[in-house]
């Protein structure tokens, strides 16, 4: 009789998990923290996409989700078993950044988060993305993270910041006490 597949294995009940390749590590290992944070980012990106009516932006966010998933898988793998995001994916992201930046007025002051549900979700995605980048820097001190992945996540936080501004639709709220 064939055993039915199940979501639980009980192998992680002691606070460890397996990297792709079989090595057991603590669930608070920096690699696990990094790919877990990218998983969290993807969940927020899904919510962001669900709150946007612009099909072109939604399609691009879905492309981003695939790239974030690739980077997460790469961090979960031992050695160089998974492909990384390509330089073309970075170039695509930079093109979207350039388009958004060209459509927005220059910014001279800090702005507050918010500006409607979609803008607030973009800002939340940006902050989770920056946290993921910080954890990836930690991982890079333990084992090499491909440079393309580091660059992609760094650019993604820029994209999400500009997307937040774009979704604000010109109604940005300035910080009342700007740094001087």
Predicted regions and their residues:
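Phosphate/pyrophosphate-binding loop motifs in nucleotide- or prenyl diphosphate-using proteins
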Residues: 1-180
């Amino acid at each position: 009789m064939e055993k039915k597949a199940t979501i639980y294995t009980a192998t992680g009940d002691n606070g460890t998990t397996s990297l792709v390749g079989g090595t057991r590590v603590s669930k608070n290992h920096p690699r696990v923290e990094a790919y877990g944070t990218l998983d969290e980012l993807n969940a927020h990106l899904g919510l962001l996409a669900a709150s946007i009516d612009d099909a072109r932006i939604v399609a691009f966010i879905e492309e981003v989700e695939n790239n974030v998933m690739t980077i997460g898988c790469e961090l979960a793998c031992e050695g160089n078993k998974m492909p990384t995001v390509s330089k073309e994916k970075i170039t695509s992201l930079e093109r979207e950044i350039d388009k958004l930046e060209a459509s927005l007025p220059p910014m001279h002051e800090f702005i507050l988060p918010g500006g409607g549900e979609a803008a607030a979700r973009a800002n939340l995605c940006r902050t989770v993305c920056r946290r993921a980048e910080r954890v990836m820097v930690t991982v890079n001190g333990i084992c090499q993270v491909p440079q393309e992945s580091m660059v992609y996540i760094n650019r993604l936080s820029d994209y999400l910041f500009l997307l937040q501004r774009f979704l604000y639709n010109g109604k940005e709220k300035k910080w009342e006490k700007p740094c001087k």
